[in-house]
Amino acid sequence: MREIVHLQTGQCGNQIGAAFWQTISGEHGLDGSGVYNGTSDLQLERMNVYFNEASGNKYVPRAVLVDLEPGTMDAVRAGPFGQLFRPDNFVFGQSGAGNNWAKGHYTEGAELVDQVLDVVRREAEACDCLQGFQITHSLGGGTGAGMGTLLISKIREEFPDRMMATFSVVPSPKVSDTVVEPYNATLSVHQLVENSDETFCIDNEALYEICMRTLKLSNPSYGDLNHLVSAVMSGVTTCLRFPGQLNSDLRKLAVNMVPFPRLHFFMVGFAPLTSRGAHSFRAVTVPELTQQMYDPKNMMAASDFRNGRYLTCSAIFRGKVSMKEVEDQMRNVQNKNSAYFVEWIPNNVQTALCSIPPRGLKMSSTFVGNSTSIQELFKRVGDQFTAMFRRKAFLHWYTGEGMDEMEFTEAESNMNDLVHEYQQYQDASISEGEEEYEEEQQLENEE
């Protein structure tokens, strides 16, 4: 079976990761200690994509939990699903990275990284046919951003031909955790552009908006935000965990979604959005799902796709859905919004189906889009980065850990290049676009 090894690093990564495991354990009929008491064989059929089977009908997540301070790990351990994880897979330091990317990437994190890689290796060896890795982390802090990207590059070295998917929480425009967020995020994007195969961008502010606007929660907690993220993660990984007619795995998703290797930053959305505990009291139809799924208010990253164009996108429908209806609706959306799709990639919408809906819903859909408007997000961080870097504000925290200013300049220009690349393909018309696309294809064929 095509297994996936999951890593969660830093406070944010561990909290999102914990929510993810809670969600998929529920979908597979596992209780808080990993014992199976589900109702359907379908829950078991592909259990081993994410779980190892232990003795006594118990299943253990193939997860590695990493942090540079013990706090969040203790919270995960004390949580409702704390007994699920294998105790040896908790790897933590004592010192913390203090929101400093350099500490996570070069000093504190580098000391811990071999220990983590041992655990990763052990998990990878227990797999029949490892498909790839997924990592949850944030880009604004020290551990998730600095050490997370260090782990990604180390795993890349050791498993060059396996997929690397990241669920990355990007800094949001208005809600900021720390002053040095723009530094940490830019340095991280610099790494992700080179080392990740697919990055699902999530941002707290967009999640807040969804909670307040759509779910009518007056003051959403991180629990509510994480619940949304875990719904998307569960949706994106559905096809891997349940048999379906139109299955996709990480690699298929990447092949369909990434037209140029550097442009692999996706926006995600989920429908129907219901608040925790409030299962919907009305039937949802495929047209409604499609409608809500393509709604800009539904995107979990603060960039509006109407300011750019979709290179590619993918929709995953779950539940008892008629194949024909889905195709019709998707065609419908494309015709209605044809201005927002680039015309030089024909059939750039991919659909996958899975017959098992999430808990408490009859049907749902998950949306993954590769839109050029994601550049807004990088632009925003880039502007904040430039403002501080021009004055060399806060730099001593990084140079003190042995970093060089040159590295900052490199990261900045790499991110600016990324923005320009997105812009270039957004402006490309069918005549010039096809030539470039064909050139790319020729180059790839020659390789």
From Swiss-Prot:
Q: Which UniProt keywords apply?
A: Cytoplasm, Cytoskeleton, GTP-binding, Magnesium, Metal-binding, Microtubule, Nucleotide-binding
Main subcellular location of this protein, as a coarse class = cytoplasm
Give the record's subunit note.
Dimer of alpha and beta chains. A typical microtubule is a hollow water-filled tube with an outer diameter of 25 nm and an inner diameter of 15 nM. Alpha-beta heterodimers associate head-to-tail to form protofilaments running lengthwise along the microtubule wall with the beta-tubulin subunit facing the microtubule plus end conferring a structural polarity. Microtubules usually have 13 protofilaments but different protofilament numbers can be found in some organisms and specialized cells.
Q: What is this protein called?
A: Tubulin beta-2 chain
Q: What does this protein do?
A: Tubulin is the major constituent of microtubules, a cylinder consisting of laterally associated linear protofilaments composed of alpha- and beta-tubulin heterodimers. Microtubules grow by the addition of GTP-tubulin dimers to the microtubule end, where a stabilizing cap forms. Below the cap, tubulin dimers are in GDP-bound state, owing to GTPase activity of alpha-tubulin.
What InterPro entries would the database entry show?
A: Beta-tubulin_BS, Beta_tubulin, Tub_FtsZ_C, Tubulin, Tubulin/FtsZ-like_C, Tubulin/FtsZ_2-layer-sand-dom, Tubulin/FtsZ_GTPase_sf, Tubulin_C
- In the UniProt record, the gene name given for this protein reads TUB2
Give the protein's cofactors: Mg(2+)
